[in-house]
Amino acid sequence: MDSEGGKKPRPRRWLRRLGVVVLVLVVLMGGVKVADVALTAKERADHPAPGQLVDVDGHKMHVHTTGQGDTSIVLLPGLAVPAPDLDFEPLVRELSGWATVTVVEPFGYGWSDVTDSSMLPRDIARDVHTALHAAGVKGPYVLMGHSISGLTSQAFADQYPDEVAGYVGLDPTIPHAKFFDSQAGPAFPRFYLWVFRPMVQAGWMRIITAFSGADPSFMFGASSADGYSKENLEQQRMLTNWMMLSANVDRQATVLGEAIAQTRDLRFDEKLPVLVYTAAQTRDAAYTDAEIAEYVGSGSCRRSVIVDASHFVHHTEYKRISEGTRALMAECRR
C-alpha cells in the first residue's frame, strides 16, 4: 500500500529476518573471538614455557634443552606446526639419552612471540643463532630440520659454518628440485586464504579442535599410538588454539617462493656429515632420486634413507632417526 492512504509501507518480512540472521552471526562471531582471547590469556598464565624465553631483537623466543650428551643437536620445525617442542617430544626422548637436544621455536611458533620477522631462511637462521647463544647452548651443532626448516638449516650452515657439526634432514624441503620451479606464490591453497585463515583469526580454531577427537591428528598426525602422552596431546591441542596460522606462519608460507630462491644454490660443505630421511610419499610426489642425491652429496659421511612414513617422519621413525644420527656422528664427527 502506498502513502496516499496515510499509512507507511510495511517492511518486507525477509528483510527483517535477514537482519536478525546478520545480528545473530555478528554476536556469535564476536562472542567466539572474545572467549578465545580470554581462554588463551588464562591458558598462557597456567601453562608457562617449559624452556627458556630468551631475548632476540627485543622479542622472546622459546629454547628448550634436554639431555647432557657431548653431541649438541638442534631441532627446527616444519611449516605451521603450532607446538614444535611438543611435536618433537618422542624424538627428543630418544636423542636425549645420548645427546644434548635443543628445540628452538621460531617466532610465531609454540611459546615464542609473534613478530614482524620476514621469516626468510637467512633471517630465521640468524634469530636461531642468537637464541642458542642467549640460552647458553654450546656448539658446534648438529642441525636437525623438519620440512621447511631444511632451508633454515642450509642458511645456518652457510652463515655459521664453524658452528655446525652435522645436518640431519627430516623429510626436508629440497630447494633445487624442479617441483619448486613454478613455486612463486604462497605455500597454502586458496581455500586456506579465503576460508580457513579468516576462521582461525576469528577464534574458531577452538571449535575445530573440539571435534578432532582424543588425538589432535586431524592436521599433523600426532597420536598416542606413536608414543605421545595424553598430557602432551592435550597441550598440543591447546597451543594449536593459540598459534595455529600465526602472522609469522602466514608470512613464512607467503614468501615460500622467495625462500626457495634464497637457498636454491646452497650446498652443504663437503666435509660436513649429512643424513637425510625422506618419506617415500614425498619422493614420489615431489623429488627425483637424482635431486635427493644431489642434496645429500656423496661420500661415506653422506647418507640418504627413504622411509615408509608420513611427511612427519619423526612421529613414527624416532628410534631409527636417533640410532642413525648417533652412528653418523660416532663415525664422522669432525
Which sequence ranges carry the predicted segments?
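Conserved hydrolase catalytic core segment
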Residues: G139-A184
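Conserved catalytic-core motifs of eukaryotic protein kinase domains, centered on the activation segment
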Residues: D85-D87, S112-S118, F179-F180
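A catalytic-pocket lid/entrance helix-loop region that shapes and gates access to the active site
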Residues: L170-A210
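Catalytic active-site module of serine/aspartate enzymes centered on a nucleophile-bearing elbow/loop
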Residues: S298-R334
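Conserved HGGG/HGGXW glycine-rich cap/lid loop of the alpha/beta-hydrolase fold
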Residues: H59, T65-W111
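Active-site loop/oxyanion-hole signature of alpha/beta-hydrolase fold enzymes
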Residues: T66, P106-M144
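Conserved serine/cysteine hydrolase catalytic core
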Residues: Y228-S298
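Alpha/beta-hydrolase fold catalytic core
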Residues: M1-I73, S96-A99, A293, C301, ...
